[in-house]
Amino acid sequence: YDDGVNLDTLGSPGSYANSLAIASVDNAGFTGTYFQVGQRMFSYTETTGYSNEPLATIPGEYDYIFIDGFGTEEDFAALNGALEGKIAFCSRGSTSFYQKAEAAVKYGAVATIVYNNQPGSINMDLSDYTQSQPCVSILQSDGARIRSVSEPVTDDGGQELYRTGTM
């Protein structure tokens, strides 16, 4: 009986036909990581084994910039310095994960959060990342939720440039 969707792992022999698997309530090895936007918690996938620090190394509240773009250098340059000292949110796609993070850091980001552009989680490869600022990923649906609660920032003509908030 399972009445909720959650992160789980099922291995052999429990995954074989005609077998019975029992879930354990003791978890000595996996603790979920999350950040908060508004009143909601969002889990993320930490990218480890590269030069980047964990997201938890930047404690406290930070403002963020949420762009609808892929996190190219041009996307971040167009923010005209607004990213300085903030966390960057950008979409998966168009450029490699390390290029997104490198570009965000170049324009002042203290961390980069990549939201998936399709359902499911991302296992990012940051092999060529040369910075220490954190870079993590979140689900597409979580990216959409964060975008929806973020405040739009517009130019003088009313065109949306990006969205912002605090986490």
Q: Which ranges hold each PLM region?
A:
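Structured lumen-facing ectodomains of secretory-pathway proteins
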Residues: Y1-M167
